[in-house]
Amino acid sequence: SKKNSYTQEQLYEQTSSGVVLIQNTYYYKITLSNNGFYSTNYVFSKLQDGELKNISHTISNNFHEINDTIKSTTFGTGFIISPRGTIVTNSHVINPATNKNLIYQALIRYLKKEIDYCNQQLEETRNHLEIFEREIRDNRKLDSQGYAMMMEGIQSSRKWIDTFTQYRNNRIRDLSLSNFEVELCSEIKIAYNGSHITSSNELIDCFVVKDVPNYDLGIIQIADGSNFWNVCKLGEAPKWSSEQMELGWSNIHNAGTISWFTIPQDKYIFNLYNNETHNDEEIKLYMIGFNQGPILALTNDGIKAQITQGYISQNTDSIKIMYSIPALQGSSG
């Protein structure tokens, strides 16, 4: 309605403090097992062009013990929806889509390739060993220095034969394991719009509350070091008035006693309870987010979200709409 009409600048000024930049650092962990008697793990950064990038065997379950070269990082946009630091975003921001069957096929190719490589190296190393041993056995002109070099070659060859044999046998064993699982291991952090960030260590830790891939919906929560969830003491969920856009924090009706807030009290809280209906007229739409993540967001005045406009081009159903707004990776949310 005209009463609730805002310019692009007014919308940005009122709501941008409730927008957050989301950083998801993640890797995938594969577990192979044979009904509980034996299991082994591999980690990789992503599936690309049919290959598991940066794949490595691991014995660690600690996120921070995994080499950073194995991890991928993606960015997205989130919106604060409660004073306790609950944030809504897209599922694919916190849970990048992948295909378990394609991962399994890529793993099998990787294991077979590793086995073939070991067999090739074993053949070459055994040939070298045979040359060293024959030189010692048949070369009567071999002096002490030459003899020492041949012995060093023999010892090195035998060591590499043992190493390649063990590695190959382990890959053959892994290839025979019948149970296969893939797990996403991630560390999710956020930065408030307008904040000055110099490194990822300054970002705020979050954890996943709900992930609904079918609707591309994700809910994350700002983590408190002493208490991950009950950071607000509420008799019941806060009730939001229909005047959210104008009243901001003052629209919380006293539904209970809030001991303290997770987020700074100058942050805008988005209203998810607006059931306003529209007719079929063309509706102007605004998108606020972080196109290309920190690449465009980092400014001399801190992290800044961008706001763009377009129109709803099609109401597909009650859940999905199509819109004509320019957007880049990082604006998801």
Regions found by a protein language model. Give the residues of each.
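N-terminal activation segment of mature serine protease catalytic domains
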Residues: S1-N90, E183-G194, S200-N201, D205-V209, ...
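Terminal peptide-recognition signature
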Residues: V20-I22, G78, G85, T89, ...
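Sec/Tat-exported extracytoplasmic proteins
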Residues: Q23-Y26, T89-S91, N95-T98, G289, ...
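Short, flexible loop/turn elements at secondary-structure junctions
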Residues: Y26, D224-S226, A327
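Short, solvent-exposed loop/turn elements at domain surfaces
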Residues: Y28-N34, P96, W229, P294-L296
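Short, glycine/charged-enriched secondary-structure capping and boundary segments
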Residues: N35-F37, L102, N300-I303
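Flexible, gly/ser-rich surface segments that form the specificity/activation loops bordering the active-site cleft
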Residues: L47-E51, N62-F63, N67-D68, T73, ...
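Catalytic-histidine neighborhood of serine endopeptidases
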Residues: S82-Y215, D224-G225, L234-W240
